[in-house]
């Protein structure tokens, strides 16, 4: 269970790095913010890619499980950064995504 919590925490940090790396260019392109924001955006996406290499499972399984956490972090971003309160539908969808992530992450593993 401790490994599950560690991996979930790593997924959370990975999702934040990805969202920041995409949000900053969005600010530049849609809100007229300084192009200098592209520098930390690129750094954030590089950190995101590096963080993905730290996950213990096969890449495809890691990306599938990570997707559930990403959805929840994006909903938190919607609420805290964009100032939009998630709807009941958003929350139910996020819960379903987390359930899918847990099923993937907690599946029985063959003994090595």
Curated annotation (Swiss-Prot):
Pfam families: UPF0060 (PF02694). The keyword Transmembrane helix applies. The keyword Heme does not apply. Its main location: membrane. It is a multi-pass membrane protein. Disulfide bonds: none annotated. The chain crosses the membrane at residues 9-29, 34-54, 65-85, 91-111. Keywords: Cell inner membrane, Cell membrane, Membrane, Transmembrane, Transmembrane helix. SUPFAM superfamilies: Multidrug resistance efflux transporter EmrE (SSF103481). GO terms for cellular component: plasma membrane. It is found in: Cell inner membrane. PANTHER family: UPF0060 MEMBRANE PROTEIN YNFA. HAMAP family: UPF0060 (MF_00010). Belongs to the UPF0060 family. This is UPF0060 membrane protein Mpe_A1656. The lineage of its organism: Bacteria, Pseudomonadati, Pseudomonadota, Betaproteobacteria, Burkholderiales.
